[in-house]
């Protein structure tokens, strides 16, 4: 593997890691659970409403999502 490809791979991996990283204090915690389960999503817009972007193939249960919009890799789930 050439050094240029290796450098490109490292840069892409670093960008992805920085994009999905979230400071523990930024994520809201579940109030009824002391094990500190955190929501993992990014803000997005869907049909004129704000939602949460999820990288998974479907909106997770238990958050009260009623609709969603498809994006390139995931979904924007809206309450």
UniProtKB/Swiss-Prot annotation:
Potently and selectively inhibits voltage-gated potassium channels Kv11/KCNH/ERG. Acts as a gating-modifier toxin that shifts the voltage-dependence of ERG activation in the positive direction and suppresses its current amplitudes elicited by strong depolarizing pulses that maximally activate the channels. GO terms for cellular component: extracellular region; nematocyst. Keywords: Cleavage on pair of basic residues, Disulfide bond, Ion channel impairing toxin, Nematocyst, Neurotoxin, Potassium channel impairing toxin, Secreted, Signal, Toxin, Voltage-gated potassium channel impairing toxin. The keyword Signal applies. Residues 1-21 form the signal peptide. One of its GO terms (molecular function) is ion channel inhibitor activity. SUPFAM superfamilies: Defensin-like. Residues 22-38 form a propeptide. It is found in: Secreted; Nematocyst. This is U-actitoxin-Bgr3d. Disulfide bonds join 44-76, 46-69, 59-77. It comes from Bunodosoma granuliferum. The keyword Disulfide bond applies. Belongs to the sea anemone type 3 (BDS) potassium channel toxin family. Its main location: secreted. Pfam families: Defensin_4.
């Amino acid at each position: 593997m050439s050094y240029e490809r290796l450098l490109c791979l490292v840069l892409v991996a670093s960008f992805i890691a920085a994009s999905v990283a979230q400071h523990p204090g930024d994520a809201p915690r579940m109030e009824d659970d002391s094990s500190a389960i955190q929501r993992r999503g990014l803000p997005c817009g869907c049909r004129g409403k704000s939602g949460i972007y999820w990288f998974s193939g479907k909106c997770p249960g238990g958050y009260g999502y009623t609709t969603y919009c498809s994006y390139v890799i995931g979904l924007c789930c809206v309450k």
